Amino acid sequence: MASAGSTARRAGSGSWHSERGEGRGARPQPTPHGSMQRANKVSLKATWTDAESKQPRPSEESDQTTIDQTAIRSYYQLFAAAVGNVEWLRFCLNQSLREIPTDYKGFTAIHFAAQRGKLACLQVLVEEYKFPVNLLTNNSQTPLHLVIHKDNTTVALPCIYYLLEKGAALNAQTCNGCTPLHLAVREGLLDCVKVLVQSGANVHAQDAMGYKPIDFCKIWNHRACARFLKDAMWKKDKKDFACEMRKMKTLKSQLALMEYNYLIEYQKEHKILREAAIRKWLHGKLHPGHSLVSNTKQARATALSKTPEQRGSQCSSSFHPSVEARLQCIPQPTEMPKPIYRKSTIKRPTMWNVSNNPARPPTTKISHSQGIRLGVHPDPSPEHDFSSFLEVRPDRHGGAWLHTVDGHWVAPVPRLPFEVLLRMLYPHVRPYRMKVPQGFYPISMREVPRKRHLGDDTFWTDTLAMNLRDTFDEAFLAAVRSHQGLPALPSPQINP
């Protein structure tokens, strides 16, 4: 017992000495029992601290609750728009008026309503809560894209009419370049295709792969849509071509005015240069009687003495016309007279002459104007040729660049093919149907193009004989094989 007590006292004194030693700066090794207790205290303290840190604070609790309520409310709003419950949708929208909630795909309430064809929800969202009709998803889809679906065959048309009335983008493209017309054609919805085309959809729009709506008709074998689109594309092309031709007519009148002004300035400059050259020549001569004024008056008198017929013939007969001749050839820009509307008079048809006597009125008139051209040269083109004033260059898009001789570029140029622009601006280079007398020459049948040329190794006689026969007997087949150089077929052996 004494040893045990002394041992305990030594342990206690050792512990006390160790604490005092720590106070003095000495650091003896601690006992194992003290280290275990100290470790347990530290671990308990750390556990309690972690629990305190994990326990939410009151402010964070309120924020998390608000976020959860907002997410649930937005989910209810999207679900109400999808099922078409208008009252539930109004209740959810009245609770969140700050921003438009979306899901992970970027869909909002108007997208879900359009995807399910809920017209009442669309009207509430657009008219009462001012949702934009061209709101985009993450894939750049608009409500007009989503309403065109094969499941909405019966409800798609009213929704399309409503969205178009509210200003929906008719040719909006998704991230793949698809327009609403592409989707309607792919689904084979002919009524939707008609509504979109009649509203002004671009029938030549291309997606990211370069496909047009008519190409989707061919891929999915929608013949009715293809037939309608083909007719719409033809009408669109003709309308655009007529519009561009009207622009071309206006451009030609502007070019004629530009050429006229250019030739006037060119004539003035050359007149000044000629007078300066004549004055220099006269100063170099030793004839004082020659004066510039008399020569100028004489030249003007000579020019004025020419008749208009002689001036017109000079324009057409000269191979290199002068500036004056070119000015006479340019049609003068004149203002169109205002149309005068007169009251139409009703004329009764004349009575038929029932008499056989041609001398009695009304006398029969059988003469008519000469309609056959007797000349051998083609008639001159009534259109003005701009080849001496304008240069036409093709561009890489199939159109043309117009450049004048005085260094100006003409813009804008009508969107017409290069061949059409060249034919309209250079009518003199237009090929004629037949040039007389070069157009009259004999044509041999050997020069007529054929599908294939029959050579010596072609047995066309055998083919003709086979087409003319009704049955192929053994004798005929043997003759054909011998003609072609083939061995005869062995005769069939009859089994006894």
UniProtKB/Swiss-Prot annotation:
Signal peptide: none annotated. It is found in: Cytoplasm, Cytoskeleton, Spindle; Cytoplasm, Cytoskeleton, Spindle pole. ANK repeats lie at residues 105-135, 139-172, 176-205. SUPFAM superfamilies: Ankyrin repeat. Residues 1-15 have a biased composition (Low complexity). One of its GO terms (biological process) is positive regulation of microtubule polymerization. Residues 1-66, 292-320 are annotated as: Disordered. It comes from the Eukaryota. Keywords: ANK repeat, Cell cycle, Cell division, Cytoplasm, Cytoskeleton, Mitosis, Phosphoprotein, Repeat. SMART domains: ANK. Required for normal progression through mitosis. Involved in chromosome alignment and cytokinesis via regulation of microtubules polymerization. Interacts with PSRC1; recruited by PSRC1 to the spindle during mitosis. This is Ankyrin repeat domain-containing protein 53. The lineage of its organism: Eukaryota, Metazoa, Chordata, Craniata, Vertebrata.
